[in-house]
């Protein structure tokens, strides 16, 4: 099945959504890898666009202007996060659930309610920012002189919320190609508009440039969203109330989860700061950022298709458990070698991305990498709770993780300094895995497949071996061990990914190259 479904009529939406979910295992793996490649490629291009935009704006605006841009951008992000009440995430779930029924009318109703709720929340968010512009200006800049500029940011909040909801519609229907294009072309159009404004008006265009970037994203998302055919329906009040209640109920749980994550991260940093000072806080920040950089990229790329796909199958326990196992296995195969490499080259990575002064954070980074490896394992399981729409259980598990994370940091930082914060991060994910597995087992009868368990064992042993080598052996021996483990895990991952994706579907030139490297194998039995 194409990652970009060709939906030419409302009936086609329903037909695609209700198509039998049981497919050959190799097709499932190929779908995962294709969607990951699409979203990952678009994300990489977005990063390039963002870097170019930042570079150009830095040259045009200078440090002060760029700092002003960052402050205004933070205001937009804060108000947007609060105002949209999590519907950007719950919208994906509701659209995917409607699509999973194969009912074209229900899809149209859910999409219509999502659009109306997002417009209402966008207007409320913009109004909130206008009303609070004076105190926000005083809080941020020390005076109310920039209140009018802060008020103008309300337009950016409105466009962002509308854009997010249209993206949720596209993602929920699993139009992954369109979803990737929305991200890239929205960023490109917004960046070109913002740069043009700054070229003409300089620092005075900082706020208009943020509005232009948001408007560009909204315009592109609207263009692709309007291509999705929908049945014509007239919404009844009872339907609006039911759909909006479900949308906002789960959305609030997502928002609460985000606040818990931010609060726990803030709490850990505050503990490190109070106990060891600013330098230690900087070491932990560097380790935490780099530890999650590659894993975050992989999981974000994979989640764009995995989440709506799982929602559509969530009432079929056997199929949904198969999908979670497939996703977990591919996640480990993609992220595992990266974790082994980061563990091995921790000091070098810190020096390259920051400076040689951050070398002391290497051990903290290794502890964070252990936690991130566990995160890769638990991440697909957690989606079972989210896909079921159980906001209470979702909130409880997130709250438990946050409390354990801060509690462990409070106990360990006093003894081990910033390294203790890394240990706490790892310990929190050990707790998360032990908590999550029995929960999802009771919900859907989930258990690891033999193939997934083998991948967990292989990469668990690999990462643990590299970590222990740096704890027990001289640096030279540890580096040699890490290099060998990274090489071996990379070869293993490539062979497994090629086997799962069925090499016969690759271009002939690629098959010949793989054959020369003796990595060519047949698809799964």
Question: Model-derived features: where do they sit?
Answer:
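Helix-loop junctions and terminal segments of transmembrane helices
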Residues: 85-101, 171-172, 287, 291-332, ...
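Membrane-water interface segments that mark the loop-to-transmembrane alpha-helix transition
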Residues: 30-46, 72, 77, 81-134, ...
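Transmembrane helical elements of multi-pass membrane transporters/channels
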Residues: 34-51, 66, 186, 210-217, ...
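Alpha-helical transmembrane segments of multi-pass membrane transport and lipid-handling proteins
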Residues: 2-18, 112-141, 191-192, 199, ...
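Interhelical loop/hinge segments that connect adjacent transmembrane helices in multipass membrane
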Residues: 4-32, 221-265, 308-319, 444-456, ...
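Membrane-interface junctions at transmembrane-helix termini in multi-pass inner-membrane proteins
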Residues: 158-183, 369-400, 442, 449
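Membrane-proximal transmembrane or re-entrant/amphipathic helices at the cytosolic face
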Residues: 2-23, 468-525
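Hydrophobic alpha-helical transmembrane segments
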Residues: 147, 151, 180-229, 286-288, ...
């Amino acid at each position: 099945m194409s990652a970009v479904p060709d939906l030419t009529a409302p009936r086609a939406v329903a037909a695609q959504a209700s198509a039998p979910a049981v497919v050959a295992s190799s097709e499932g793996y190929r779908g995962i890898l294709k969607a990951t490649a699409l979203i990952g490629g678009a994300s990489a291009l977005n990063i390039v666009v963002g870097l170019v935009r930042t570079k150009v704006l830095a040259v045009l605006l200078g440090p002060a202007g760029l700092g002003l841009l960052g402050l205004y951008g933070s205001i937009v992000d804060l108000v947007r996060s609060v105002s949209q009440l999590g519907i950007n995430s719950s919208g994906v779930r509701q659209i995917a659930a409607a699509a999973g029924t194969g009912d074209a009318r229900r899809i149209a109703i859910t999409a219509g309610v999502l659009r109306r709720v997002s417009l209402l929340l966008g207007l409320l968010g913009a109004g909130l920012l206008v009303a609070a512009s004076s105190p926000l200006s005083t809080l941020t800049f020390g005076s109310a002189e920039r209140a009018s500029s802060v008020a103008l940011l309300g337009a950016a909040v409105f466009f962002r919320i509308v854009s997010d909801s249209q993206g949720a519609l596209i993602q929920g229907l699993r139009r992954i190609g369109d979803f990737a294009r929305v991200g890239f072309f929205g960023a490109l159009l917004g960046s070109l508009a913002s740069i043009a404004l700054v070229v003409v008006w300089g620092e005075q265009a900082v706020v208009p440039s943020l509005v232009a970037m948001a408007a560009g994203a909204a315009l592109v998302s609207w263009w692709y969203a309007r291509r999705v055919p929908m049945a014509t329906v007239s919404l009844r009040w009872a339907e609006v109330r039911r759909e909006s209640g479900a949308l906002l109920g789960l959305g609030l749980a997502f928002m609460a989860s985000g606040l818990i994550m931010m609060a726990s991260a803030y709490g850990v940093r505050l503990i490190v700061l109070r106990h060891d000072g600013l330098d230690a806080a900087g070491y932990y920040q560097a380790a935490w950022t780099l530890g999650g950089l590659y894993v975050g990229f992989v999981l974000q790329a994979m989640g764009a298709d995995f989440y709506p796909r799982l929602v559509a199958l969530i009432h079929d326990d056997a199929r949904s458990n198969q999908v979670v196992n497939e996703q977990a296995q591919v996640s480990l195969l993609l992220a595992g070698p990266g974790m082994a490499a980061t563990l091995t080259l921790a000091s070098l990575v810190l020096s390259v991305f920051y400076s040689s002064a951050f070398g002391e954070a290497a051990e903290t980074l290794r502890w964070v990498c252990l936690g991130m490896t566990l995160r890769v394992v638990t991440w697909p399981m957690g989606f079972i709770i989210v896909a079921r729409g159980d906001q209470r259980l979702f909130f409880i598990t997130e709250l438990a993780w946050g409390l354990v994370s801060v509690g462990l940091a409070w106990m360990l930082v006093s003894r081990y300094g910033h390294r203790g914060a890394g240990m706490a991060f790892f310990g929190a994910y050990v707790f998360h895995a032990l908590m999550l597995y029995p929960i999802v087992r009771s919900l859907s009868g989930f258990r690891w497949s033999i193939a997934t368990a083998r991948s967990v064992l292989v990469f668990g042993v690999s990462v643990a071996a590299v970590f222990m080598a740096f704890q027990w052996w001289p640096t030279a021996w540890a580096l040699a061990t890490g290099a060998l483990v990274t090489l071996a895990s990379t070869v293993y991952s490539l062979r497994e990914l090629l086997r799962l994706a069925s090499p016969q579907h690759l271009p002939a030139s690629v098959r010949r190259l793989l054959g020369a490297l003796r990595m060519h194998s047949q698809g799964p039995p």
